Amino acid sequence: MIEVENLYKSYGTKEIFKNQSITLDNHCIYALVGVNGIGKSTFLNAITQPYLLDKGVVKIDGIYSSEFQAKYHYAFVPDTKEMFLNLTGKEYLDFVCGLYNQRERCTDLISDYITNLKLENSLDMTIQTYSLGMKQKIYLIGALISNAQNIILDEPFNGLDPESVAVLKGILLSFRDKG
């Protein structure tokens, strides 16, 4: 569960959020919908990076998001795809498995996701050579194999072809249903 209490964020004199509160249950799908520049990405970044908040409290599964242990309760894919560019896809996924101490369960999951999202021929390439859609897929797979109870995705379909969008929707619905 993600609990946001009295979130306040401004950029200069422009208030983005003023005393906003919301509770989001685990294994549910929520979407932030709004016009460009309204603060959707800012909201997601504030949940995962509490030092960006001007005021407010964020708890993830009862743990303050500023505490290190909270990071094991969520996985976040931001809207910018410029992380771990010098790693190959395989190295990145191995890193994520180790980070979340999930090596044993990762192999089968990775294989399924790689096949379903058609990345099997790209794992030995560095992420910097990936297209936007390929980067999106590899980071999404990283979030999904984390075994976190909360998956936070900013612009999850950005750069994906229609077939990959359909596959990802199915994967996310399956994640939700496993609860």
PLM region descriptions:
Residues I151-E155:
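Catalytic Walker B motif of ABC-type/P-loop ATPase nucleotide-binding domains
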Residues D94, G98, R105-S122:
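Conserved ABC ATPase "signature" region
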Residues I2, F17-N19, K71:
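Conserved structural motif at the start of ABC-family nucleotide-binding domains
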Residues T48:
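Helix-to-loop junction immediately C-terminal to a conserved catalytic motif
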